[in-house]
Amino acid sequence: MLKQRVITALILAAILLAKRLDAFSPELARKGPRVVIYEGSNKLVTREDKPGLKGYAVGFESLVDFVHSSAPLNRFVEQVVREEVKMFPRQAIRELVANALVHQDFEASGQSVMVEMYTDRLEVSNPGLPPIKVERFIDEFRSRNERLAELMRRMRLCEEKGSGIDKVVHLAEVYQLPAPDFRTSETRTIAILFAHQDFAEMSKSDRIRACYQHCALKYVSNERMSNQSLRERFKLPESKAATASQVIGATKDAGLVKADESDTTSTRYARYLPFWA
């Protein structure tokens, strides 16, 4: 038992602090995060393929800097703040990469954390399926690798339990981006940040996802979603109140939000809760 604990401690130290992961073992080297930058919106042309060689703590900030610097510019936010702004917020990239590192399944052989950037989106994925439903990422937290998570929190590489995804959703709203998407494949968990889209360009599913995430974010902030707050999220004028109501109605029909009946029965001043509240 003591020997196993020592081995586990050594592996943790190596995966966090190693100057080169491949100096320890081929298996550990394959756990380094890999960054791939594509020329277009598909995988046909690769601009850069950069395997992660350093331990997570040693190479984390430089990895995030590289991904952020490779992102396209956000001309829509630039017009407001009058300075160069990258499409994907650095803090959001940081949270998603840290989250993927912490929650990966280390027993999945031949797989690693992947950061893939396209012209219209950023995908961060990790081996292993989440222990909770993706719809609950905003309000729930359950770590697959608690010791690694605790060490990374102490090193200030990731947030306190459960707050990282909240920040990603909030930053998407601030930077006028579509709602991030959280998905699962057969073996991986995938988080996607999308490039800017005007409301008119968003699909119905994009609008529903944004409405649900906005509602959940409001709830965990001890607030409530309203027609007005959703219009502000989508940058819609007051004259588009009916449009916002249609989005709320579609999100209710999808079973993702519900009316807060404890507040008011008035349709005009209605407040909404996520389905799990």
What label would you give each PLM region?
Residues M1-A277:
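C-terminal regulatory or interaction extensions
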